[in-house]
Amino acid sequence: MRLAIMLSATAVAINFATSSAIDQTKVLVYGTPAHYIHDSAGRRLLRKNEENEETSEERAPNFNLANLNEEMFNVAALTERADAKKLAKQLMGNDKLADAAYMWWQHNRVTLDQIDTFLKLASRKTQGAKYNQIYNSYMMHLGLTGY
């Protein structure tokens, strides 16, 4: 009789321990720290980004990275809305220019907060949501997403 009670109590304890361990793994899988780095990161990654490679190639077919002015990527120095909007539109329209900007930002340790401020300056009405592709691509360049 005691053996049956001990076996059933052991089975209940093992079942309880495994079910609580499974719940913890679900929390660890779904709660990645990449989304907690910046306040708007979770919202930005949920939006769909549509890219059309044909139009981006038509906009700048003869782009030369050797002719770049490095200071054009300095988002911390941008204070005028028109300059920020111009840079954001250029980055949206040209993948090679955007990649060069991401490398420059990473080398100069530009934070996601600075990028978010720059994008909010570029489009005040939508609080930077218009240029989510730039923010998301920079996060992917830094390796902060699961892609």
UniProtKB/Swiss-Prot annotation:
Location within or outside the cell: Secreted; Host cytoplasm
InterPro entries according to UniProt: RXLR (IPR031825)
Post-translation changes: Proteolytically cleaved. The cleavage site directly after the RxLR sequence and the high conservation among other effector proteins suggest that the RxLR motif might play a crucial role in the intracellular processing before secretion. glycosylated.
Induction data: Expression is induced during host plant infection.
Signal peptide: 1-21
Modification sites for N6-acetyllysine: K48
Keyword rRNA processing found: no
Quaternary state and interactors: Forms homodimers via the RxLR-dEER motif. Interacts with host E3 ligase CMPG1. Interacts with host DRP2.
Domain remark from Swiss-Prot or TrEMBL: The RxLR-dEER motif is required for the delivery of the effector to the host cell cytoplasm but does not bind phosphatidylinositol monophosphates. The motif is cleaved after the RxLR sequence. The RxLR motif (residues 44 to 47) plays a crucial role in the intracellular processing before secretion. The Glu-rich part localized just after the cleavage site (residues 48 to 59) is required for homodimerization.
Family, similarity comment: Belongs to the RxLR effector family.
UniProt protein name: RxLR effector protein Avr3a
